[in-house]
Amino acid sequence: MKIFFFLALLALVVSATFAQYAESDGSYEEVEGSHDRCQQHQMKLDSCREYVAERCTTMRDFPITWPWKWWKGGCEELRNECCQLLGQMPSECRCDAIWRSIQRELGGFFGTQQGLIGKRLKIAKSLPTQSTWALSAISPNSMVSHIAGKSSILRALPVDVLANAYRISRQEARNLKNNRGQESGVFTPKFTQTSFQPYPEGEDESSLINKASE
């Protein structure tokens, strides 16, 4: 969510940045001296951000932690100071500043943490090329998914477990692991339903009670 906020803010800054350019002979020329001024503001913002990263990270992000009471109040104040520095920047300098912040968010502070997108990419790259169990583990609805459904789960189970769980033979369990076409035979009842007759023919409730009492 934070990244999307940065991107939206970046779009607004880009639109405002073009207003700071002067058009000459069909091309845009940057306002004189803005580059040096932006570098000075960027150095201040980098120092502020690095200080926040050093003092206000949690154990999950950085090996150093500080007392909770100080962390809760002090870090919010430090972040507000960084936001004020960003707000004081000229509009033509904010574009690069926000883009650098996005890069830090994706890569983490000082390389100690991976951003959310980086973590997901790392997990995706570490998955094997062919693994039905991996597909089942990351599927949001594995029991009904055609790609990672019962087939992938059953293939991950030993033959003996399937045979005992569904009370089938080892050969049937082996066929079930390797062939989805056999699944319907497991999940359908093996008994046939018969019509229920409450009393035998020619007898009623009183006759049955008399037989039971004898």
Curated annotation (Swiss-Prot):
Pfam families the UniProt entry points to: Gliadin
UniProt keyword annotation of Oxidoreductase present: no
Signal sequence extent: 1-28
Protein's name in the database: Avenin
GO MF terms held by the record: nutrient reservoir activity
Organism: Avena sativa (Oat)
Purpose: Seed storage protein.
Region (Disordered): 180-214
Keywords: Seed storage protein, Signal, Storage protein
